[in-house]
A protein has these predicted regions:
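DNA replication initiation modules
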Residues: 56-83, 92, 113-170
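DNA replication initiation on ssDNA origins
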Residues: 1-70, 80-88, 155-156, 161-166
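Active-site palm subdomain of RNA-directed nucleic acid polymerases
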Residues: 89-100
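Residue-level signal for beta-strand positions within conserved beta-sheet cores that form or flank
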Residues: 95, 105, 155
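Short, conserved phosphate-binding/catalytic loop or strand-edge motifs used
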Residues: 99-108
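Broad hydrophobic/π-residue packing in well-ordered secondary structure
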Residues: 14, 107-112
Length: 170
């Protein structure tokens, strides 16, 4: 559990929650309610996420000192996204990325760092990678390069592996 927390470390004072309403039909986006909770991120939240206890956990990658240890390109695709083709391209280019299926059926392309780096550096690198992979318009997390105040939370990304072994996000 602690390894999962370390890998998906982020803002400690707030997190995202998503409640899924129903099972989508082919080619449709999962419908649900997402919001930010301004309360501490705990080990129990990570455990609940992996055990499939709703709501899904969303982590805000940018921290209070405007650094992050991971970032993500969020490819929204609701029907027939070819994960194998994406993985083949990443492998061919020898990019240090991890791909997980997102709840929409698209992909979350993660870039991890061994140490916390400036959010701007992470965003800049992901923008470059996004262009190389041909996904120039897809979202990047962290979305911000700095939090403007103690009240600012940034944007969250739903983590992979909701429901652990039964997940569709792998």
């Amino acid at each position: 559990m602690s390894r999962f927390e370390d890998i998906f470390n982020g803002l400690k004072r707030a997190h995202g929650c998503t409640y899924i309403n129903d099972t989508p039909k082919n080619g449709e986006k999962l419908k649900g309610k997402s919001f930010i909770k301004r309360e501490p991120v705990t080990s129990q939240l990570y455990e609940n996420h992996l055990n499939g206890i709703e709501a899904t956990l969303g982590i805000i990658p940018i921290t209070d000192d405007n650094t992050c240890i991971w970032g993500c390109i969020d490819i929204d695709s609701y029907d027939g996204f070819d994960h194998q083709k994406l993985l083949a391209k990443i492998n061919l280019l020898k990019l240090p990325l991890v791909v997980c299926r997102s709840k929409s059926g698209g992909a979350h392309i993660f870039l991890f760092s061994k140490i916390f780096i400036q959010a701007k550096l992470m965003r800049d690198k992901l923008i470059e990678i996004r262009a190389i992979l041909g996904f120039g318009n897809d979202e990047i997390f962290p979305k911000q390069i700095e939090l403007k105040s103690e009240e600012d939370t940034g944007n969250f990304l739903n983590l992979p592996y909701f429901q652990g072994n039964k997940t569709t996000r792998y």
